[in-house]
Amino acid sequence: MSASESHDTAYDSLTEDHGADGQWAFGTGIEDVAAEITSPVPDGVDPADLAQYCLMLGDDALICSHRLSEWTTNAPELEEEVALANIALDLLGQARLLLARAGHVEQAGRDEDALAYLRPELEFRNVAMAEIGDELDFARAVARLLLFSTWRLALLQRLLTSRDPVIAAVAGKGVKEVAYHRDYAARWALRLGDGTAESHRRMQAALDGVWPYVEELFRTSEVEVALTAAGVAVDPAQIRAEVDSVLDEVFAAATLTRPQRPGIGTIAGRGGRQGLHTEKLGHVLAVMQGLARQHPGATW
Amino acid sequence: MVNGAAPAAVRAQAAVAAVVDPEMPMLTLDDLGVVRGVEVRAGGEAVRVTITPTYSGCPAIEVMRDDLRTALAEAGFAAVEVRTVLSPPWSTDWISAAGRRKLAEHGIAPPAGVGPRSSGPVPLALSAPVDVVRCPHCGSAATDELSRFGPTACTALRRCTACREPFEHVKEI
């Protein structure tokens, strides 16, 4: 069966031989992601900075997506498994576009797959909140997703007017998607927080557990400073008040207490945006990149 | 079947119009509102179709590309290019009136209107939307949302409390 024939279901294409056209990201038959990817770098913007910024936004989505996908076959209810898988898929779609854009503007011959599957840990630019994972604790998944998606939604909202056409387009689709993710997490936070004594205790404990990773979300990197001035990026420090007010609304309704816990801090001012990660990212990459590294060039 | 008599632009439009969505095959891609343009080039030998994805990660777009290429090759075009563009983002408001009718006939509740996006922050929704979604089986307005996320990226799961049937609802974006 050739790739040009139609399929009865979306899964039939998985069984075909795609020769040199196969790719890793979604499996077989995946092609160039969108026409906008090859748009020129906006005037006055350093391509290296733009590539780094696309990696920041893309790695946040990719690594968070991978962590959410760990719930597949492990969620407490089928509906929640489907929901978390759907959210992971939306974020993977955003990641593909941003990594493809990073690969295009850095001009080092790396496509989205090379960036996702062959990049070493020190080159990942995601925040720790994306990588720490849920340890199969559903309340922790709710807490992490609430914090991550409330923050990402505020970022994407401001990126709608980014001078980079790919970032603006990803934001245009992403705002709609991430608003659903945030509301999903907020409703579960409400249900668990304002539920039984046991569900309240576990929801509060989960929130306390991930809170040290909040501070990093609002720390501005040098790349973000330069690109905010150029009209491409958002200074994350500027969205803190908006994020806090949304979180306070959820906490109040859910009878949860805003944790008073110090952030994880930096090492000589460096964190995830500079490639310094917790040991958890190594675990993620070992799983996510293992197959691609053991079978270089393999496609399916 | 190659029909050399009809003008190329008409043949191309007709071929594209017949391609259906892989996950909701009661809808054509036209009904779904993902076809953004059909251009015939090179004196009628080549055609370029522009489509837009529904959700960022929707894997169905790959099957759509395949099916468009096949349909246009069968319509006699030697060179077929299928482009994907992201902007402006797809909205369920682009689903045609015929598409909405077909969804309901197949037991899937069509989306309500979204309208233009407001520019401020997206308000938090701590409870399921109260919009009336009618049961596509019995027409009752007494339906509940079971899950915001359904079997495909674009649908939610609901249940009718009158006839007790579960059904999918194309959620508004």
Q: Which residues make up each language-model segment?
A:
Chain B
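A short amphipathic beta-strand at an alpha->beta junction
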Residues: 70-94
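Residue-level signature of catalytic and energy-coupling elements of molecular machines
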Residues: 16, 35, 58, 80
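Short secondary-structure junctions
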Residues: 19-32, 75-77, 137-141
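Short edge beta-strands and adjacent turn/loop segments
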Residues: 26-52
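N-terminal presequence-like segments and adjacent domain-start helices
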Residues: 1-18
